[in-house]
Amino acid sequence: KAVREKHPEITVVGTVGPFYEGTDYAEGWRLATEMGVPMVDEHYYVDPGWMIHNQDYYDRYDRTKSKVYLGEYAAHLPGRPNNIETALAEALYLTSVERNADVVEMTSYAPLLAKEGHTQWNPDLIYFNNTEVKPTVGYYTQQMYGQNAGTQYITSHITLSNGQEAVRKRVGVSVVKDEATGDHIVKLVNLLPVEVSSTVKLKGIDLQNPSAVKTLLTGDPKDKQARSVTSAFVDIGGTEFPYTLPAYSFTVIRIHENKGK
């Protein structure tokens, strides 16, 4: 209360412990609710399966309580590699986080930096030595989200020819608008070992003479060297267009209106 009165520009952030459940989590949230803490810092390091099966995690949150800063998170596999499997699990989960941006106001992968030969924790996002900087595969997931965050979420749905829950949970979509540029941004994640054919339908949106660029991150699940590649997206013709999601991939399609051209 004193901080809010003296420095209203400062947001007080509480903590709810290092896990997504348990005593610290429950008591932290109880205290935050009791004290009216504006925002809480959540941490969790989980296996990719947790991220696949908990895409409704923030759907269930009470909108009247504290906002969330997801301050530490990552997908962990045995041996702690940072590879296509972990990077795509994080990309898939972030589609649901983006959908719940009214609750989750900020996120940050952790840890961020580590010097080779002097690490206490793996995986980290960016490794370096005295002469090189070595971004991981997961870095490119973060970069693709960071450069295409948007400011307005647009409700979207994806329909698959195979309706099995196991299939549905491994394909994610998020659509946002960047109000500063007017660009519409479509994010598509495919954690399946096969291609997925889709038709993107941006209902209720009027695009004038659109053009688009596509950024794609894909590879074998164990690939630790994959990098995102950006290219022109030639199939854009309006608010409805086909797109085939490659197996094990994260795609960002950024659509720009060329008004007056």
Residue ranges and their predicted role:
Residues 1-81, 87-89, 93-94:
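Active-site neighborhood of glycoside hydrolase catalytic domains
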Residues 161-168, 189-261:
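C-terminal beta-sandwich/jelly-roll accessory domains of carbohydrate-active enzymes
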